[in-house]
């Protein structure tokens, strides 16, 4: 299992590093805050909402579904306290969310420091913004992971659950883009930390509100997912 986990992490590193260079090569050598903005929150940037919802969902769910031992339905069925088992699964999702978000952030910090001057990054508070953004990513992918778990509990298929979650999130992303007027809040807007912090639009209070909203969403998914899991019939 250790070798499998190491391979998963190495594959994720390779994927994210490749994507970072592919998305950002146009801006390398242009030492400006504007370049940092384009790289991190343009339409196709490494840290854009588009990337979070279209590029990273499947790799994250692949990591989540393969990082721990496969679930044994007979073992779960014999458990007296299935609620505790579900909580342990949420802890696993939380761990993988933190791992994925940390790797994503470390790659962004490392690669950016290679191509941009230290003085510019200090002036832009780039490191601090990366870490604040990472916290938001942990909550976002925790909610995605719980959504995946409840979908898996409904259909008993990992592949189908990944497909359904991906389609739902992509449909929501494009639906919001097309149908919801600018100025209205929706969950994806809370992923725009780079734009708002680099442009100094947000203060600490804005970040706290974002985190609270994300925690509420996680809690709602947890309640729904817990109900589905506890009522799941493993005999089927």
Swiss-Prot record:
Question: Please, which domain of life does this record's source organism belong to?
Answer: Bacteria
What this protein is called in its record is: Uncharacterized protein YybL
Q: Supply the source organism for this entry.
A: Bacillus subtilis (strain 168)
């Amino acid at each position: 299992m250790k070798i499998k986990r190491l391979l998963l992490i190495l594959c994720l590193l390779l994927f994210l590093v490749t994507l970072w260079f592919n998305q950002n090569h146009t801006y390398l050598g242009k030492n400006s805050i504007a370049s940092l903005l384009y790289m991190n929150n343009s339409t196709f940037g490494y840290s854009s909402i588009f990337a979070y919802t279209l590029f990273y969902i499947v790799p994250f769910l692949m990591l989540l579904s393969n990082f721990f031992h496969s679930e044994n339905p007979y073992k779960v069925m014999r458990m007296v306290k299935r609620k505790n088992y579900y909580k342990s699964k949420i802890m696993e999702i939380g761990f993988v969310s933190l791992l994925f978000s940390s790797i994503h952030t470390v790659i962004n910090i490392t690669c950016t420091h290679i191509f941009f001057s230290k003085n510019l990054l200090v002036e832009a508070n780039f490191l601090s913004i990366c870490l604040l953004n990472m916290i938001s990513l942990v909550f976002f992918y925790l909610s995605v992971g719980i959504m995946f778990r409840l979908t898996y509990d409904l259909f008993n298929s990992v592949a189908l659950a990944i497909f359904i979650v991906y389609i739902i999130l992509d449909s929501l992303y494009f639906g919001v883009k097309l149908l919801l007027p600018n100025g209205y809040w929706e969950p994806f807007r809370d992923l725009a930390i780079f734009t708002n912090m680099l442009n100094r639009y947000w203060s600490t209070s804005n970040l706290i509100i974002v985190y609270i909203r994300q925690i509420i969403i996680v809690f709602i998914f947890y309640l729904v997912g817990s109900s589905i899991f506890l009522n799941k019939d493993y005999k089927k």
